Design a protein with these regions (language model features):
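Well-ordered alpha/beta subsegment
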Residues: 99-104
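Glycine-rich nucleotide phosphate-binding loop and flanking beta-alpha elements
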Residues: 66, 120-121
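Metallo-beta-lactamase
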Residues: 1-97, 108-120
Length: 122
């Protein structure tokens, strides 16, 4: 059996372009989006990875939690990160919804690997 990799996008994170692409000449603290316009906002995909090989089925990362669909949910879940990061998670794009579309139940996963532990999905 070979290895298959499927990239599953679980919405986007809306941030100031200075957060991922800080350039010389950007104002100090521009990554916070303080005193900057809507034109400085960008949407960055929040991705997970489904890997299937002879060792089984592995999910790498879990993406946005559905609680982040509401503003209050984001404020509670993202806490101090909320002013800098805004979640956009359309219906049907949460990881559990996408796995269900594929006929995969959480118990079918052999391994869940978290690449990092942010408050939004850890």
């Amino acid at each position: 059996m070979g290895t298959t990799l499927e990239i599953l996008h679980t919405g986007t994170v809306i941030v100031d372009r200075a957060l991922p692409y800080h350039r010389p000449g950007d104002p100090p603290l521009s990554w916070t989006h303080a005193f900057r316009g809507r034109d400085d906002l960008i949407a960055v995909p929040v991705s997970t990875y489904l890997v299937e090989n002879s060792h089984g089925l592995t999910l790498i990362d879990t993406g946005w939690h559905p609680v982040n669909r509401s503003r209050l949910g984001q404020m509670a879940n993202l806490r101090h990160q909320y002013p800098v990061n805004k979640a956009d998670l359309p219906e049907g794009r949460a990881i559990d919804e996408q796995l269900e579309e594929r006929g995969i139940r959480p118990r079918d996963l052999d391994l869940l690997l978290m690449s990092h532990l942010h408050c939004d999905h850890a």
